[in-house]
Amino acid sequence: MTGISDEEIRILADTGTHVLSGPMTNAYIKNRCPVVELLESGVNVAFCTDASAPNRTYDLLEKLRIGLWLHRSHFKDANVLTAGKALEMITIDAAKALGLDDELGSLEEGKKADLVLFDTQKPHLYPLWQEPLRLVYQASGHDVDAVIISGRLLMENRTVSTVDEQSILTAAQREAEKMLDRTGFRESAGMPKRFWKSTRY
Protein backbone atom coordinates (compact mmCIF):
# COMPACT_ATOMS: atom_id res chain seq x y z
CA MET A 1 0.00 0.00 0.00
CA THR A 2 1.57 3.29 -1.12
CA GLY A 3 0.49 6.86 -1.73
CA ILE A 4 -1.68 7.04 1.39
CA SER A 5 -2.74 10.49 2.55
CA ASP A 6 -2.89 11.59 6.19
CA GLU A 7 -6.69 11.48 5.98
CA GLU A 8 -6.59 7.92 4.65
CA ILE A 9 -4.24 6.92 7.49
CA ARG A 10 -6.79 8.33 9.95
CA ILE A 11 -9.58 6.33 8.28
CA LEU A 12 -7.47 3.14 8.42
CA ALA A 13 -6.84 3.73 12.13
CA ASP A 14 -10.48 4.54 12.89
CA THR A 15 -11.75 1.45 11.09
CA GLY A 16 -9.19 -0.95 12.60
CA THR A 17 -7.93 -1.87 9.15
CA HIS A 18 -4.75 -3.96 8.96
CA VAL A 19 -2.07 -3.07 6.40
CA LEU A 20 0.53 -5.30 4.75
CA SER A 21 3.74 -3.75 3.48
CA GLY A 22 5.87 -5.44 0.81
CA PRO A 23 9.10 -3.42 1.18
CA MET A 24 10.88 -4.86 -1.87
CA THR A 25 7.87 -4.25 -4.08
CA ASN A 26 7.60 -0.69 -2.75
CA ALA A 27 11.28 -0.09 -3.50
CA TYR A 28 10.86 -1.58 -6.97
CA ILE A 29 8.14 0.94 -7.83
CA LYS A 30 10.21 3.72 -6.22
CA ASN A 31 7.71 4.34 -3.46
CA ARG A 32 7.09 3.33 0.13
CA CYS A 33 4.24 2.36 2.35
CA PRO A 34 4.15 4.95 5.19
CA VAL A 35 4.72 2.23 7.79
CA VAL A 36 6.03 4.50 10.54
CA GLU A 37 3.19 6.99 10.12
CA LEU A 38 0.64 4.15 10.12
CA LEU A 39 2.11 2.57 13.25
CA GLU A 40 2.24 5.89 15.07
CA SER A 41 -1.43 6.40 14.19
CA GLY A 42 -2.36 3.06 15.74
CA VAL A 43 -2.70 1.01 12.55
CA ASN A 44 -1.51 -2.60 12.72
CA VAL A 45 1.09 -3.18 9.99
CA ALA A 46 2.82 -6.42 8.99
CA PHE A 47 5.68 -6.96 6.56
CA CYS A 48 5.12 -9.44 3.73
CA THR A 49 7.07 -10.84 0.79
CA ASP A 50 4.48 -10.13 -1.93
CA ALA A 51 5.91 -12.35 -4.70
CA SER A 52 9.08 -13.86 -6.10
CA ALA A 53 9.03 -12.39 -9.62
CA PRO A 54 10.83 -10.76 -11.27
CA ASN A 55 13.68 -10.14 -8.84
CA ARG A 56 12.36 -10.90 -5.39
CA THR A 57 12.34 -13.86 -3.01
CA TYR A 58 10.03 -15.21 -0.34
CA ASP A 59 12.67 -14.60 2.35
CA LEU A 60 10.71 -12.71 4.99
CA LEU A 61 13.79 -11.71 6.99
CA GLU A 62 15.30 -10.16 3.87
CA LYS A 63 12.11 -8.14 3.34
CA LEU A 64 12.11 -7.09 6.98
CA ARG A 65 15.62 -5.63 6.57
CA ILE A 66 14.69 -3.86 3.35
CA GLY A 67 11.74 -2.35 5.22
CA LEU A 68 14.03 -1.08 7.95
CA TRP A 69 16.48 0.43 5.44
CA LEU A 70 13.71 2.06 3.38
CA HIS A 71 12.16 3.87 6.32
CA ARG A 72 15.41 4.78 8.02
CA SER A 73 16.66 6.19 4.72
CA HIS A 74 13.41 8.09 4.15
CA PHE A 75 13.54 9.71 7.59
CA LYS A 76 17.36 9.97 7.55
CA ASP A 77 17.28 8.47 11.03
CA ALA A 78 18.84 5.11 11.98
CA ASN A 79 16.61 4.94 15.06
CA VAL A 80 13.34 4.84 13.13
CA LEU A 81 11.47 1.52 13.27
CA THR A 82 13.24 -0.57 15.88
CA ALA A 83 14.45 -4.10 15.21
CA GLY A 84 12.08 -5.37 17.90
CA LYS A 85 9.06 -3.75 16.27
CA ALA A 86 10.12 -5.12 12.89
CA LEU A 87 10.28 -8.62 14.39
CA GLU A 88 6.80 -8.15 15.85
CA MET A 89 5.61 -7.17 12.36
CA ILE A 90 6.41 -10.66 11.03
CA THR A 91 5.14 -12.53 14.09
CA ILE A 92 2.39 -11.26 16.41
CA ASP A 93 1.36 -8.31 14.22
CA ALA A 94 1.11 -10.61 11.18
CA ALA A 95 -1.05 -13.00 13.20
CA LYS A 96 -3.20 -10.04 14.26
CA ALA A 97 -3.66 -9.04 10.60
CA LEU A 98 -4.98 -12.54 9.93
CA GLY A 99 -7.28 -12.42 12.95
CA LEU A 100 -5.31 -15.28 14.51
CA ASP A 101 -3.37 -13.52 17.27
CA ASP A 102 -5.22 -15.54 19.92
CA GLU A 103 -3.75 -18.72 18.34
CA LEU A 104 -0.46 -17.70 16.68
CA GLY A 105 2.32 -15.15 16.61
CA SER A 106 3.84 -15.54 20.06
CA LEU A 107 4.93 -18.26 22.48
CA GLU A 108 2.19 -18.31 25.09
CA GLU A 109 0.29 -20.95 26.99
CA GLY A 110 -2.82 -21.97 25.09
CA LYS A 111 -1.50 -20.95 21.67
CA LYS A 112 -0.55 -23.36 18.90
CA ALA A 113 3.01 -24.65 19.00
CA ASP A 114 4.11 -23.04 15.72
CA LEU A 115 7.89 -22.61 15.82
CA VAL A 116 10.70 -21.78 13.43
CA LEU A 117 14.10 -22.92 14.72
CA PHE A 118 17.29 -21.33 13.43
CA ASP A 119 20.72 -22.93 13.17
CA THR A 120 22.89 -20.32 14.89
CA GLN A 121 26.14 -22.27 14.44
CA LYS A 122 27.19 -20.16 11.48
CA PRO A 123 29.90 -17.50 11.22
CA HIS A 124 27.53 -14.71 10.18
CA LEU A 125 25.43 -15.26 13.32
CA TYR A 126 28.37 -15.04 15.74
CA PRO A 127 29.07 -13.91 18.40
CA LEU A 128 26.01 -15.36 20.11
CA TRP A 129 24.51 -12.49 22.02
CA GLN A 130 21.53 -10.22 21.41
CA GLU A 131 20.03 -13.11 19.45
CA PRO A 132 16.86 -11.25 18.37
CA LEU A 133 19.06 -8.55 16.83
CA ARG A 134 21.13 -11.21 15.04
CA LEU A 135 17.89 -12.63 13.68
CA VAL A 136 16.77 -9.26 12.34
CA TYR A 137 20.09 -8.01 10.96
CA GLN A 138 22.01 -11.13 9.91
CA ALA A 139 19.78 -14.22 9.58
CA SER A 140 17.92 -15.37 6.48
CA GLY A 141 15.52 -18.10 5.52
CA HIS A 142 18.54 -20.27 4.68
CA ASP A 143 19.33 -20.38 8.40
CA VAL A 144 16.01 -22.05 9.28
CA ASP A 145 16.81 -25.57 10.47
CA ALA A 146 13.44 -26.85 11.66
CA VAL A 147 9.76 -25.92 11.48
CA ILE A 148 7.07 -27.09 13.89
CA ILE A 149 3.39 -26.45 13.11
CA SER A 150 0.76 -27.18 15.77
CA GLY A 151 3.38 -29.25 17.58
CA ARG A 152 4.14 -31.37 14.49
CA LEU A 153 7.72 -31.41 13.16
CA LEU A 154 7.43 -30.67 9.42
CA MET A 155 11.05 -29.79 8.66
CA GLU A 156 14.22 -30.99 10.36
CA ASN A 157 17.84 -30.43 9.31
CA ARG A 158 16.44 -28.34 6.43
CA THR A 159 14.56 -31.35 5.05
CA VAL A 160 10.77 -31.17 4.71
CA SER A 161 9.31 -34.50 5.83
CA THR A 162 5.79 -34.09 4.46
CA VAL A 163 6.48 -33.68 0.73
CA ASP A 164 8.89 -34.84 -1.96
CA GLU A 165 10.71 -31.57 -2.64
CA GLN A 166 12.42 -32.78 -5.82
CA SER A 167 9.17 -33.91 -7.44
CA ILE A 168 7.59 -30.53 -6.61
CA LEU A 169 10.54 -28.65 -8.11
CA THR A 170 10.42 -30.82 -11.24
CA ALA A 171 6.68 -30.25 -11.63
CA ALA A 172 7.08 -26.49 -11.06
CA GLN A 173 9.78 -26.26 -13.75
CA ARG A 174 7.63 -28.27 -16.17
CA GLU A 175 4.64 -25.97 -15.62
CA ALA A 176 6.82 -22.87 -16.00
CA GLU A 177 8.11 -24.18 -19.34
CA LYS A 178 4.53 -24.81 -20.50
CA MET A 179 3.57 -21.28 -19.47
CA LEU A 180 6.42 -19.78 -21.50
CA ASP A 181 5.37 -21.74 -24.58
CA ARG A 182 1.68 -20.94 -24.07
CA THR A 183 2.23 -17.19 -23.65
CA GLY A 184 5.05 -16.70 -26.16
CA PHE A 185 7.33 -15.28 -23.47
CA ARG A 186 10.14 -17.85 -23.79
CA GLU A 187 12.56 -15.24 -25.14
CA SER A 188 11.84 -13.07 -22.09
CA ALA A 189 13.07 -15.88 -19.83
CA GLY A 190 16.59 -15.62 -21.27
CA MET A 191 19.41 -13.41 -20.08
CA PRO A 192 19.05 -9.70 -20.94
CA LYS A 193 21.40 -8.65 -23.76
CA ARG A 194 22.81 -5.85 -21.64
CA PHE A 195 23.35 -7.96 -18.51
CA TRP A 196 27.16 -7.73 -18.56
CA LYS A 197 29.30 -4.57 -18.63
CA SER A 198 26.37 -2.18 -18.58
CA THR A 199 25.06 0.18 -15.92
CA ARG A 200 21.55 0.29 -17.47
CA TYR A 201 19.39 -2.27 -19.29
Segments from the language model and where they lie:
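Histidine/acidic residue-rich metal-binding segments in metalloenzymes
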Residues: 1-18, 29-45, 102
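Flexible loop residues that form catalytic
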Residues: 1-2, 72, 121, 152
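Short, conserved sequence motifs enriched in acidic/basic residues, glycine, and aromatics
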Residues: 2-3, 80, 162
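Conserved strand-to-helix beginnings and helix N-cap segments that scaffold or border functional pockets
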Residues: 9, 31-32, 57-60, 129, ...
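Conserved beta-strand positions in the central sheet of alpha/beta enzyme cores
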Residues: 20-21, 117
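Short, acidic/turn-prone active-site loops that include or flank metal/cofactor-
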Residues: 23-27, 50-53
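His/Asp/Glu-enriched, well-ordered alpha-helical/loop segment
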Residues: 36-125, 136-140
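Active-site microenvironment of metallo-dependent hydrolases
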Residues: 91-201
